[in-house]
Amino acid sequence: MIASIAKKSMLPFAFVTTTVFAQSNAPEPPKVEVVTSIESQQWIGISPISRNTIWVSGVDGRVARSTDAGFSWDYSQPGPGDLQFRDIEAIDDRRAYALSIGDNGQSRIYFTENGGADWRLRYGASNDTFLNCMAISPQGEAWVTGDSVGDEWRMVRSPSGRNWIKTNSAVSAKPQSNEGGFASSGSCVRYHNDTWMIGTGNADVARVLIKARFGIRFDVIETPMQSGPGAGIFAVYPESKDNFYIAGGHLQAEQNDQPRLWHYQSGKFTALPEPPLDGTLYSLDKVDHNGEWLLTSNPSGAAAFHLQSKTWHKLSDANIWNIQCHGDAACWLAGKEGYIAKLVWKPAQAPQTNVVP
């Protein structure tokens, strides 16, 4: 057991206005309410549990938790200070799993059941394994994906969060040379709507690995996302096995000459309008609030896309690595220089009814 380093801070809020990039009758986008935490800290992982409880993780071996909607934060350190916690998956305000990334034994999974007061090491990867992203279902099943080694996938599964097992045979096809994921936001694996989904890159073809909740193996779908070294799928969002979104691109901003956001439905990929952000897209989420919205971010900012009106709204110019939501309104952003913020939505409009005199 490793004792945490905990301290609490009370933090002010600031509002940031948005920029509209198309004229339409789209509903009003959310505003960004910024909270400044440790100024030198880079936050990457986000796991909102409710409107009030949010966990974040980042470099320097640090995790933070707020239970009062971001007015104050408790900080903890699950392990050594040189670990980079690129992903965090919380169960509630007491229990959470934190994933650190890297090879040479740096890829680890820690668990707390007392709000970060203490952390236990639950899994340590071998020296040649580089884990990227983690997701946990409401039923407690977990999948962690890493970069392939030779002709083997490197994945870790837990049926309940207690025992973690390395698996190399969970995918219906072998990996391509150097195929793996990107640990930019913990968004390259996701569970949603009884569907497990993984996005890959750094290979000849960027692919989706996808299966239903009770599926035995992941099916493989080739995508039109830009591919090759430093390129591919960075974030995924499944509606079902036959309906999902992918975001990504190339780490070299000047090489992003292809669509970075795609929708797959009924066997067909459709490129969505390009967001007002430079460079590859690091994160992706979807909410339903006065219509359906896609949310994405990267080091050039964050943006919201209203699907019905096909309208982009630039939310921020900050260096934002991740944006994640819980439900239809509890959305949080995290990035460099201590950046933590939440989206504040205008109250949802009640559906109009026709009154017959």
Give the role of each language-model region:
Residues 4, 19-21:
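Serine/threonine-rich, low-complexity intrinsically disordered segments
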Residues 9-19:
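Bacterial N-terminal signal peptides
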Residues 23-357:
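Residue-level hotspots at or immediately adjacent to binding/recognition sites across diverse folds
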Residues 2-10:
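Bacterial N-terminal signal peptides that target proteins for export
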